[in-house]
Amino acid sequence: MKQGSLSYNESAGQPWSSPYRWVMLAMLWLLYAFFGLAFRSISPLITPILADLDMSYSQMGLVLGSWQLTYIGASTVAGFFIDKWGIRRSLFLGTLIIALSVGLRYFANGFDTFLPLVALFGIGGPMISIGCPKTIALWFQGKDRGTAVGIYTTGQFFGGALALIATNRAIMPLTSYSWRLTFAFYGILTLLVACLWWVLAKDLRSSVLSEQTQMKGILTTLLKVPNIRMVLVCGLLTFAIIHGLTSWLPRILEEQAFAPTLAGYASSIPLLAGIPSLLILPRFIASERRGLALGVLAMLSASSVWLILFLTGFLMFVGLILYGIAACTLVPLLTLILMETPEVGARHMGTAGGLFFCVSEIGGFLGPLLVGMLVDWTGGFLAGGSFVVALSLGILLMSFFVKK
């Protein structure tokens, strides 16, 4: 460990027995909360951005999926660098890049400048979404690991819900309804969180847990494992579902006669509904039942999308709640399956996590883009919603291939 880097001395005991692991978990939660706030912050601002920058739905769909595209490239090497640099420096750098991506959107003057600023998020994002499970794998074991995965994952949904609720209700009025100043405000907050992480986070001082094999050899070995291949396919479909629907959800609700503020409130329902399930399900679903749970959640996700698109009133809100419970739990469930695959473990979780998010974000990119294109072609969101339902049924099919 380089001089000046904070580290946990393993001679004092195993990290999973140290009380400081809960401080690390709290900091991971905070980073993931601002990760969620950053990428959800565009959705409630789609209407003023479309008007101000004179963009089409297809262009906005490309913008919404652009950071996933850069994420794909960055995540191929992010896991390797996290293992090399340590989690403290890696996650600080990732959060700093996210802060720049959000804050610099203030200067966008059209599609050509807005697109790369949003895409920049995908450079920093992998450090967070890959670094968090890597940290959990190092600092937690047993049932505590499932609990920790559930807890830190709620951060993203809390941050996303905060963006959807507060943007039009509180932040836009404070900034004289300037979407530019709103992004600048969120960027400054994210920068402050990055500095807090730098002060409090600790690296593990360990040569045993670091990657000792060449990256190419590790990837080849991992891809030969059937469970890992299944997780990769399900991850791709899951991210297409989550980003494809939730990125457009405020606009979908606005087209159903919701006011922008009310659409933001309603769009936060899936995120808030997902928080209890994230705290409960990852801990209590036994490893041998995760395949069954994956299939059930996929069916619930498909059903909920139909309720959201085709019904109104109470049943539509039931659909929003059901979607949050089902879709929000898919990623931590897949993460646990990956993390506890014997060929992965804590040793290779950085590389395996990079591979998972690299493949998954292909779906994260294509989901919003294809939904936006279907809106331009058909004039409504029903075709895009049917596409999301089909993806959920694909996960149901793949769940039969999860090995106990």
Where are these predicted regions, by residue range?
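Juxtamembrane intracellular "pre-TM" segments in multi-pass secondary transporters
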Residues: 8-18, 202-231
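Residue-level signature of mid-helix packing/kink "hotspots" within the transmembrane helices
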Residues: 40, 68-76, 161, 271-279, ...
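Extracytoplasmic gate region of multi-pass secondary transporters
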Residues: 42-44, 227-278
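Conserved MFS/SLC helix-loop-helix module at the cytosolic interface between two early adjacent transmembrane helices
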Residues: 73-110
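Cytoplasmic helix-loop-helix junction between adjacent transmembrane helices
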Residues: 117-155
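Helix-loop-helix hairpin linking two adjacent transmembrane segments in secondary transporters
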Residues: 151-201
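C-terminal transmembrane helical hairpin of 12-TM major facilitator-type secondary transporters
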Residues: 289-337
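A late C-terminal transmembrane helix in Major Facilitator Superfamily
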Residues: 344-380
